[in-house]
Amino acid sequence: MNRASLPDFSIARGRRLLIALSGGADSVALAWMLAQRRDELDLTLAAAHVDHSIRGAESRADAEYCRELCERLDIPFYLERVDVPASRLPGEGIETAARRLRYEALRRIRTRIGADWIVLAHHMDDQAETVLMHLLRGSGPDGAGGMAERSDDLYRPLLNTPKRALEQLLADQGIPWRTDRTNLTPCTPRNALRLHGLPALEESYPGARAALARHAESMRCENRFMEAAVDAFLCEHLDSGPYGQRIRDPETADEAILRRVIRRLCGSSVSHDMLLSLTALCRSARGRLRVSASLQAEKTPGAIYFLPLPRELPEPTALAIPGETSLEHFGTLRVQPAPPVSVRDDPFRQVLRTDALSGAVLRTRRDGDRIRPLGCGDRLLSDVLTDRKIDRPLRDALPLVARGNRILWAVGVCIS
């Protein structure tokens, strides 16, 4: 790889970049290339190495190599040590814990030095591995898109550069690099794919790595279009309130849009089977589905609700007369003197006698609540809400002015 064939770093001039430097060929080549473009692009560079405290003396040697490299390249160097074995979360694998702690450390350093981006040395071979792993897990369109060149505070400029080109660059420049021997054994699924799976694919399908990287780029392009369509659908159909979230008329959405909406609201970790069940629920007239320990979906005619669990309803609050009374997450009710005129045109404003409000509270509904709507006899509030076609999930989110089990005003619905 000669100077003319260096990757095109598509960044604005004057950026401050933090290079994630492991000491391996990929990140060493990245640091060297950025150092060559530093003046041309008016870059402010720094490098960070995270020692995971896993490989003992080898880890310390990696850190020392990175420090010496940065001295030669005139790049400020930051070292942070994390104890991966001691910091693993319950059920977390060593590789996952190392990645989590590494990114946390890099972000701490980025914040401390005021860098615009953390620059990562993921290359074409890494992208091919990532896409294949996602496909084998059945992760869908987002997984097929692999890694994005830019995401949040991360920048990956080498995704179209093969690993062999980076190693050739270093060989041409006479620059050594460190080798993590754990990467040379098939001790993890990714290692097995790198050492055996991809070489076998390349043997049968020459150019497989490049093809997978191109596929990922195409999928990311498609995904951006689909995410914009999801944004437009949610802008028109999504409501949020104390009850949770509501999608109006979900059955009008194309299934591809609907699946992405569900992933957006339920989290990307929702299983494929659950995704299919939720899609079917959206097409049905009524039904409920427990999505997880903290989320339930409920379908009513014309809407689907995503309700947090457990449902925590606020305690009744004594009504301030006059004054304002707040019900946590439900809003504020203002009581003030008013002339005896009708305000029936506004369901959120009503005139009540002061003596009727004595001892009243602001609360949500309870079993046995009763109300006497204007022009009607005494009725169960639940029957009134059913007649008014108030969806069941909304009923628990309805603020009520009440004395005992007597409802004086179901806010937005009717007055007693």
Language model region names:
Residues L89-E92, S139, T161, T188, ...:
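Short coil/turn linker and secondary-structure boundary residues
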